[in-house]
């Protein structure tokens, strides 16, 4: 059975996560405030960041950078900026 939450990113009610995707208090906040749709948006941004900045998840500093960008995107309304990337026009 799906849960409905008020999504911080989308600013509307949406389907919530099925389980906590991230550890600790931040993970609890994501579970309670971030919808599946918004999490999918973040995953796309995260993949771009990892690829364009050549981040390694084995590197503690790279993981910290990714977590900071995730917080900015999910909770502060700031889009991920990747130098040299131009989004496709619709």
From Swiss-Prot:
Any one Gene Ontology BP term: cellular response to oxidative stress
Entry keywords, A to Z: Iron
Cellular component GO terms held in the UniProt record: cytosol
Record's keyword annotation contains Iron: yes
Any one Gene Ontology molecular-function term assigned to this protein's record: iron ion binding
A Pfam family the protein falls into: Iron_traffic
Functional summary from the UniProt entry: Could be a mediator in iron transactions between iron acquisition and iron-requiring processes, such as synthesis and/or repair of Fe-S clusters in biosynthetic enzymes.
Alphabetized PANTHER family for the sequence: FE(2+)-TRAFFICKING PROTEIN-RELATED
Subunit details: Monomer.
Family affiliation: Belongs to the Fe(2+)-trafficking protein family.
Name of the featured protein: Probable Fe(2+)-trafficking protein
Organism ancestry: Bacteria, Pseudomonadati, Pseudomonadota, Gammaproteobacteria, Enterobacterales
């Amino acid at each position: 059975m799906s849960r409905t939450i008020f999504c911080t990113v989308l600013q509307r009610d949406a389907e919530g996560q099925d389980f906590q995707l991230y550890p600790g208090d931040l993970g609890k906040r994501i579970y309670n405030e971030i919808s599946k749709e918004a999490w999918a948006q973040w995953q796309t941004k995260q993949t771009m960041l990892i690829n364009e900045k050549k981040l390694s998840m084995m590197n503690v500093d790279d993981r910290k950078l990714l977590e900071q960008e995730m917080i900015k995107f999910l909770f502060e309304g700031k889009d991920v900026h990747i130098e040299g990337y131009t989004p496709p026009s619709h």
